Design a protein with these regions (language model features):
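Loop/turn-to-beta-strand initiation segments
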Residues: 101-104, 125, 154-157, 365-368
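Catalytic acidic motif of RecA-like/P-loop NTPases
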Residues: 35, 110, 133-136, 163
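Conserved Helicase C-terminal RecA-like lobe
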Residues: 2, 9, 23-24, 35-37, ...
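Conserved helix/coil segment N-terminal to the catalytic DExD/H
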Residues: 91-104, 109-123
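Conserved P-loop NTPase motor "coupling/switch" region that bridges the ATPase
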Residues: 81-84, 126, 134, 143-228
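Conserved pre-motif I regulatory segment
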Residues: 1-31
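Conserved helix-turn-beta segment of the N-terminal RecA-like "Helicase ATP-binding" lobe
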Residues: 67-89
Length: 376
């Protein structure tokens, strides 16, 4: 990208090298750690290829929560001269956007299935998959739909900071898309190469599993945060989460009526501060009644996005939670997903807190620490 003007903000050195690497590989992985600016690198690389006429349209596939807050925002920042559209909403609306003249079209994973035929017929010659671990299983409908819209000459860049983080076999589905010759034809053969059976239901990684996975997931570039010396101390990203139907119902009701009835209990909002606090409680998943009882709400959308963040991180995750009962709800849900979790709230003694923080900093577990904001 030596002759490139780098529109928008000035890139960091690792972003320049990442963008250059992507432009040199029709199919490639970007494994830069979370918070290193992978999105900007991919946008600049795409814009460069568009300038050269090597690609005509770009399809960005990413989580629903970052379609607007990350990708559309970053495209306006780093490629403001390009036409951008988000394919979300009804099937007809998505189809119209796919057929539009937008140079960048952003769509979520499951949205691809809705308009897969339209995408396959269109002229998307570069596909960028953000948080690519969602395509680790080659048997899923999601994986098969992505494979369907790819042509032999399609550019494909798959990005994630946590490749094969759960198991070496996770590399198979990713490699089959980018580097199919780097893995066996069948999953079972690959599994035998990277794992060995301990018992009927237990498999463990072989000693050479890391090397096998490394060779399969090529060509690839990776920068860790400590290698990116010019990064700011803190990097902020936003994610959008829709309220669940249950939350939305009572959120609107409380806004309109100022008094909400849930399961026979009255929850009063006698002033603006209390009103706002109740709305925040609904959003967080647990509302306190006037009698002190906690009433739980469906927070599957909120939890899904939190789980995405945890899965995408190669480091431990500290989560600040505004309300005590919401912490318990999150801890129980994380536990069901086998994610080791510790809690810091008002019921935890100072001595116990010290032990929890020490474990979080030095031990493999817990992976997640949930803390009340005012406690921390």
């Amino acid at each position: 990208c030596g002759q490139y003007d780098w529109p928008g903000k000035s890139p960091f050195e690792h972003q320049k090298k990442t963008a250059s690497f992507l432009t040199l590989h029709r199919k490639a992985f970007c494994f830069n750690e979370q918070g290193t600016g992978k999105t900007a690198s991919a946008i600049w690389a795409s814009d460069y290829l568009l300038n050269l006429g090597m690609v005509r349209r770009v399809l960005v596939i990413c989580p629903l929560s970052i379609m607007d807050s990350a990708w559309r925002t970053d495209l306006f920042t780093f490629a403001p001269h390009r036409k951008v559209a988000v394919a979300h909403g009804s099937a007809n609306k998505r189809k119209e956007i796919i057929k539009s003249d937008a140079e960048f079209v952003i769509i979520n994973y499951d949205g691809v299935s809705i308009v897969v035929d339209e995408i396959a017929k269109d002229d998307f010659d570069l596909i960028i998959v953000d948080e690519a671990t969602h395509y680790k299983n080659a048997q899923t409908t999601r994986w098969k739909k992505l494979r369907k819209i790819m042509k032999d000459d399609t550019w494909l860049w798959m990005m994630t900071g946590t490749p094969a983080s759960q198991s070496p076999v996770d590399a198979f589905g990713l490699a089959k898309l980018v580097n199919p010759s780097g893995v066996p034809m069948f999953f079972s053969t690959f599994k035998d190469k990277v794992m060995y059976r301990v018992s009927q239901f237990t498999w463990k990684p072989r000693d050479n599993a890391i090397d096998t996975v490394y060779k399969a997931l090529q060509p690839a570039i990776r920068y860790r945060k400590e290698q990116c010396l010019d990064l700011p101390d803190m990097v902020y990203t936003k994610r959008q989460v829709e309220l669940t139907p249950q939350q939305n119902k009572y959120y609107k009701k409380l806004k309109d009526e100022m008094i909400m009835e849930v399961v026979g209990e009255e929850i009063s909002a006698v002033n603006a501060a209390v009103h706002l606090n109740k709305l925040l409680q609904i959003s967080a998943g647990a509302v306190y009644t006037d009698s002190g009882q906690a009433l739980e709400f469906d927070i599957k959308n909120r939890y899904k996005v939190l789980k995405e963040v945890i899965d995408e991180s190669s480091q431990k995750v500290l989560v600040f939670v505004p309300f005590k009962h919401s912490i318990r709800v999150l801890a129980d849900t994380l536990s069901k997903d086998n994610i080791s979790t510790e809690i810091i709230d008002g019921s935890v003694s100072a001595h116990k807190r010290t032990d929890v923080f020490k474990k979080f900093q030095t031990n493999a577990d817990p992976q997640v620490l949930l803390s009340l904001i005012h406690i921390s």
